[in-house]
Amino acid sequence: MKIHDCCSTADGLVVGVQRHEAVSQHCAQRAVEAVSGVLGRYRFGGSLRLRLQRIMFADDGIVAQLNYRSPRVTVRIQVPIVAEDGIEAIADRLDCHIRRQLTGRPLRSWPDPQRPVVGFVSECRPITRRKRFHLMVLEPHIAAAVMDTFDFDAHLFIDAETGQDAVVYWAGPLGVRLARQSKMAPLSTAGMMTVNPIPTLCLSEQAAIQRVCMYGLPFLFFTDVRDGRGRLLYRRYAGDLGLVQGRATAPGR
């Protein structure tokens, strides 16, 4: 069961909170106070949506997802915490993201100690969230910046250099890696990231699910056998799976 709360602060910040019934109101209030304290220092006003839900595969685990929008910055963060002891981690991550946007600092470092990989072996789990978007046509380094801004583990987009679906994701040795469907052209922005040299697997949706769950993968970028488009299948904190796919036909096909 989901519980919705809404409030506003003295500096004009409008706050909406959605929490799972297993997450106490006291925990939600502490989280609101922590992030409001950060935003109060910047005096941006704006609107904040905070969602708190239990992590089904971790005792006392909570995942906090925060979306903040103001005339100055737009921030999305997602961070797992252990019970109420990790509330400050939400505020710290928000502060870091805002400062990086305001100062133009480089992408966050990887590995990220606040965001352990959500990957574990399990029986085949269902896809409980499907996201269909008109994918943005981006240069790979811009896609990496979008991934960082919205605190994604991986980001699906149309690669401006090849015209194909592609993903960027956090991985060594440079922190960001690019995976393309089949065209393994060298990057025009050399040194920004590494490129996965292996063409993307062509799979059915069910085969992709089996691969993620059998091998404990946090996500899988694959080409769907039905239409030849790229898909991003990922493990959710709730334990089930999510799928991201594009709506429009990619250019250059």
How does the language model describe each region?
Residues 1-253:
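N-terminal, polar/charged subdomain of small-to-medium soluble alpha/beta proteins
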